[in-house]
Every structure is written in C-alpha cells, then in structure tokens.
C-alpha cells in the first residue's frame, strides 16, 4: 500500500528479478516459501473457493474475508506469536482482506522472455544498446535464426567445421531437428545462442561506460569528417550521429538510475494483485472476469508445457522445444501489449482482449481516468460563451456556480459581519437568495482568483487563472483572445472551474497563471493571444466595407443592392457628390449619425483627418478635381480627398472609410495608448 505521507511521486521503471520475488515471497511457519503462481486455475467449480497456487490463491495474495482463512477459521489480525499469524492447516495469513489490492505474485518463466516495450518500442532500447538492427533481434528472439557463441578460449564445433566466419554469425537454417532435447540443450549451451536468452547474455556483457566512451569517439570522428558532397552519405552520417547521441543518453540514464540492461529480459513475470483483475459473479450464474486473467492463464499453460518438455520429456524433438519457447514469448507479449505482433488476441465472441498496455494507456486508462481525472471539491463545469465586455484577465461565472464555489467564504463573512448567528441560518439565507448574500459574494470574489481548465490539458496554457465576475445565465463567459491557449471555441465546448483555497495556491495563480501574464507560447515564443475564429469573422464583417475606393461606384454605387439595375449611360450616376457620401469632421459625429440610423455600419463616408505628410507628399494622380466659385478646389483620389484654397495651400484632408473601420481603429488606438501608459509607469 502506498503511504500518501511518505511517497510523493510515482515512478515506472525496470526492477531486478530479486525485487520481483521479494514483492511476492512469503515464508510460512513450516519453512515453506509461497508466492509463485504455478496453476492457471482461478476458483473451484464446486466450492467457489480460490484454487491453491492459482491466480487467486489465498496463500499468495491473502484472505478474501478479513481475518478468515480458507478453512473458515478466524483469528485476530494482530498476533503476538509469529506462528499464530498463519493458519496451520491451509497456510493463509490472518490479515485484512485489503491486502489483495497490493499483494503480488510471480510466475517463474521456463525460459527468458524479452519485454515487448523495450524491444519493439520506438525507439527500441534493446536495439540501441546492442547497436543491432531491430529485425535481426526480433528474428533471434522468436527463434527464426541462431548465432554462434563467441568463445576465444576453446575451439567450438561450429568453428572447427568452418560454418561461421565471424564470432557472431547468423544461422538461417534449422539445426535443432538433428538433436534430441538433452542433446540440443548441451549443444546450445556450448555452441549457439537463440531466443531471449541470447539477448540477455549480450546485455549482461555490456559495459555502459565503455559504450559511452566509444560512442563519443565515433561521434567526434563523424563530426570531424564534415560534408562529403554525396547527399546519401551525408544523410547516413547524420542518422548515425543522432543514433550515437541517443545511445549515449540511454546508457547514461541506466547508470544514473542503477538499472542493469539485462533486466529488460524477464526471468520472473509479476502477477497483479487479484483485486485489480477481479472476477465478478452476477445474477443468473453469469461470471464477468478481467481479460488480464485469461492472458495470465495463457502464459501459465504455455510456460508449464515448456517446463514439462525441458525437465521430463527427454525424447521430445528440439524443434518442439523452440516452438514452445516462441509460444511463451508471444503469450507474454500479448499480456503486456496485445497486438504488438500483428492481430491482437480475441475471445470466442471476436472481442479483443485488453492487455496491460490497454488498461494503462489512453483516455480510459488507469492514469487518465482514475488518477488524473478525479472529481474534486470546489469545482464546477459549464459551457463557455463569448464575453465581449470582459477584460483579458476576467471571466464571467454564473450565479449558481459562484455561490456554490464560494459558499464557505460567504458563510464566514455572514457570521463575521454579524448578519447571522450560526451556519444553519447562513445556509438558509443563501438558499433564500437574500440581497446581502450577493453583496458579500461580490466582495469575496473581488480578491479571489479562479482556475479555468479545458480538457485535454496538453500544455500549461490549458489551465489559466482569471478574476471572476458575476453574470446572468448558466454559462461561463470567456474573453475570446484566450481561446487559442485552451484550443477552445464557442460551439458547445465545456470548461471546468476550480477554486484555489490555500494562500500558496492563490499566490501561484496570481503570479504565474493569470491569463494576461501568459501572452506568448511557451513552446515557440509566438503570441498566443491572437484573434481566431469568431473574432476573425467579426473583424471581417466590421471592416467589409467598399475596399475598391471611389472607382467602385461605377460598378456598385453606395446603397445599391447587388440585383438592382444600374443605368451606366448616365455619367452623373457614378460621379462624386457630397450627397451620396456624407462628410464628417470627427469620428464622434460619424458615431452619432450611426446611432441616429442616418448611415450604416459599412456605408462609405468621408472623415476629416489630420494632415499626413505621406498623403501630402504622395505623387498619386487625382481621379477628379472640382473647383468652386471662391477658388477652393477638391482633389479626389481613390481613398482620400484633399481640400485646398486659392493659394494652393492644403486646408484639410478627408479619408474615405466606413464606420466599421473607424470603430476598429478606435479600439486599437485605445489599446496602444493604454499599453504606453502602463509601460511608462513601469519605467
């Protein structure tokens, strides 16, 4: 059992066979050692009791009922005498039944078996350490070929006959049919190596420090060679350099964690506690069992058959032994990772068995479903909608969620301010929704941040802190600029809200997690708070006005619908006039005209603008020049209008725009001015 006060983290890694045996081994008072699972049976079909030395054995994993052994005798869990802790008849320990959640067993494999995660994973750790191709290692593990044992002290049979040129040479033809089982075992122990045992021997002979030194020397040699000009050779050199770096990192990791490379080949297979792979009896004599039990049964049966062939059947052909070793390897592979060698194992109803990898990985795996995705107090969940009036660091919480999250704080303040005398009356005031409750709730929320999280949390911007504000309705309001960090949109996405309770959590939320402090992507440094989706559509609609300038009036004059017939013979129709496109001296006048419904959002208009040297010094030729009786003139360009006097002096400039462009410009101008003021304060 993991003690939550002693253990602060969980690490998954390799362990030695001695450690696996220590997890499961028990010594009975009579000196008998239990812990090894040798039978594939589970429960007896008549008594419904666990079979001895089976997958649910009470001697190995503990009693099903607390303090009651397999015989039915009961005794206190705590006994002064060591002999009294075990039943003298059945050997079951008198302990709490919860031990079956963490007490493990083991299967002693008749032959070494490689761990499929370390052989077929990407990258393959075994192939990287041995510096061998993965396909050849797989062929060696599954008995497709053998190689000669390197032996320099004495001549071997294969060396005398000259069948192999190198110390380690492949033998692609079968040797085993020429030997009986004892003869083949003797031959294999002296001359050849095959199966996972050959991999284990090579891993055991490795010196990790020498691997690091040799790999570093080779990497430096490749680095000094430089580029040869041959694209294919340069590519092979780059791949080799990357491989050497990975190999050095892997060897360094093994040294730092005190892990031996040969532990990647299993001699003892751990058996999970029975409560983690239960058998459930339902009504109607229906039995529901975990798929892992069936996979364990398969491993035990094949392992027992191999042990029988190796120990008791002296006349069995060696091909049968090698085939059985391959079956044991495949059974363990299926238990650890179903489908690693192609088609996964299926039951009689064509349903795929779930292996240990399937139980652990994925969204419904053990980690994400039961360890990471647990329900917690002081949290809520609702659909998100856009909050256009919110600041970047604010979020809108519905009244129903806010009063639930901050209920204890509201009760505390109600009692502190003597609005109520006890907790019961305070809860009644909250339930009746009295006005004082909302006043205190707003005071409490003003200085307390909340955390918003959208699953899946793939990076640290998936959970950010916000200052909550009360909103009507039942949805959470969110500023649209923070959507990219959450990878969220407003089409029905849901987000969870959490309340940090401790002062440390609140300080971390304010200093590190507030949304206005996470403006850049932590991965690449690009801005993360950029307009996306709904905002882009809104900006497009806001600035969709006539972009082709005054010349577009010839094709679609202001106020005409696309289907309206235009008389192009009338030259005055598309001629510039002040009546069609009104003039405004300021943006406030234009906004006032829009509120009075005199102009539309995308109606073209002329807005008086400050003198701009880029416009004054422009060499653009006007489209039309109009002169008035007092000598003033109007030079009309595609997007602006220049008004001059008789002395050819520019009196004013009007730009051709729309109210949408004006509104967008005002928002950007206010944002830039606010940033400049904030920057000046920091200086």
Swiss-Prot record:
One of its GO terms (biological process) is DNA-templated transcription. DNA-dependent RNA polymerase catalyzes the transcription of DNA into RNA using the four ribonucleoside triphosphates as substrates. It comes from Saccharum officinarum. It is found in: Plastid, Chloroplast. SMART domains: RPOLA_N. Zn(2+) binds at residues 69, 71, 87, 90. This is DNA-directed RNA polymerase subunit beta'. Belongs to the RNA polymerase beta' chain family. RpoC1 subfamily. The lineage of its organism: Eukaryota, Viridiplantae, Streptophyta, Embryophyta, Tracheophyta.
């Amino acid at each position: 059992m993991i003690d939550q006060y002693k253990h602060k983290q969980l690490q998954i890694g390799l362990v030695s066979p001695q450690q696996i045996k220590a997890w499961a081994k028990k010594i009975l008072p009579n000196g008998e050692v239990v812990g090894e699972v040798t039978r594939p049976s589970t429960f007896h079909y008549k008594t419904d009791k666990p079979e001895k030395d089976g997958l649910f054995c009470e001697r190995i994993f503990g009693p099903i009922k607390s303090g009651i052994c397999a015989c039915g005798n009961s005794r206190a869990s705590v006994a002064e005498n060591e002999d009294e802790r075990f039943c003298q008849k059945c050997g079951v320990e008198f302990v709490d039944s919860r031990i079956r959640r963490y007490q493990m067993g083991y299967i002693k494999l008749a032959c070494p078996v490689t761990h499929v995660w370390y052989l077929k994973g990407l990258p393959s750790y075994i192939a990287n350490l041995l510096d061998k191709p993965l396909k050849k290692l797989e062929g060696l593990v599954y008995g497709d070929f053998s190689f000669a044992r390197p032996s320099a002290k004495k001549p071997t049979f294969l060396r005398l006959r000259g069948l192999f040129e190198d110390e380690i040479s492949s033998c692609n033809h079968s040797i085993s049919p020429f030997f009986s089982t004892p003869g083949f075992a003797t031959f294999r122990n002296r001359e050849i190596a095959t199966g996972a045992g050959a991999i284990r021997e090579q891993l055991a002979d490795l010196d990790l420090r020498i691997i690091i030194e040799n790999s570093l020397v080779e990497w430096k040699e490749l680095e000094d060679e430089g580029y040869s000009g041959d694209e294919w050779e340069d590519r092979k050199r780059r791949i080799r350099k990357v491989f050497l770096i990975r190999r050095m990192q892997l060897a360094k990791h093994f040294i730092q964690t005190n892990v031996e490379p040969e532990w990647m080949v299993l001699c003892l297979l751990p058996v999970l506690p029975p409560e983690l792979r239960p058998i459930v009896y339902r009504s109607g004599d229906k039995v529901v069992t975990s798929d892992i039990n069936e996979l364990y049964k398969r491993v035990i049966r094949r392992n027992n058959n191999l042990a029988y062939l190796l120990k008791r059947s002296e006349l069995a052909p060696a091909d049968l032994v090698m085939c059985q070793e391959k079956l044991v390897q495949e059974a363990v592979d299926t238990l650890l990772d179903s489908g690693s060698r192609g088609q996964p194992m299926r039951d009689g109803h064509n349903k795929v068995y779930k292996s240990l990898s399937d139980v652990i990985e994925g969204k419904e795996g053990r980690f994400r479903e039961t360890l990471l995705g647990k329900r917690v107090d002081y949290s809520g969940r609702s659909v998100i909608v856009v909050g256009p009036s919110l600041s970047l660091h604010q979020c809108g919480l519905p009244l129903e969620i806010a009063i639930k999250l901050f209920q204890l704080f509201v009760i505390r303040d109600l009692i502190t301010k003597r609005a109520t005398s006890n907790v019961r009356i305070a809860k009644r005031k909250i339930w009746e929704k009295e006005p004082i409750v909302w006043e205190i709730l707003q005071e409490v929320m003003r200085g307390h941040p909340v955390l918003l999280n959208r699953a899946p949390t793939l990076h640290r911007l998936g959970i950010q802190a916000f200052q909550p504000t009360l909103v009507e309705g039942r949805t959470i309001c969110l500023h649209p600029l923070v959507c990219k960090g959450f990878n969220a949109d407003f089409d029905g996405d849901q987000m969870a809200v959490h309340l940090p309770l401790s002062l440390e959590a609140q300080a971390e939320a304010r200093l590190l997690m507030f949304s206005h402090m996470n403006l850049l992507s932590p991965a690449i440094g690009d801005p993360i708070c950029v307009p996306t989706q709904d905002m882009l559509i809104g900006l497009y609609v806001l600035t969709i006005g006539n972009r082709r300038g005054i010349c577009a009036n010839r094709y679609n004059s202001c106020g005409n619908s696309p289907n309206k017939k235009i008389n192009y013979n009338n030259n005055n129709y598309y001629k510039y006039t002040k009546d069609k496109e009104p003039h405004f001296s300021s943006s406030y006048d234009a906004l006032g005209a829009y509120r009075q419904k005199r102009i539309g959002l995308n109606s073209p208009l002329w807005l008086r603008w400050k003198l701009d040297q880029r416009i004054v010094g422009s060499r653009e030729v006007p489209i039309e020049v109009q002169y008035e009786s007092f000598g003033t003139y109007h030079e009309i360009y595609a997007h602006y209008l220049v008004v001059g006097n008789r002395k050819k002096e520019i009196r004013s400039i009007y730009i051709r725009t729309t109210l949408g462009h004006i509104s967008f410009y005002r928002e950007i101008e206010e944002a830039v001015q606010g940033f400049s003021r904030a920057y000046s304060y920091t200086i």
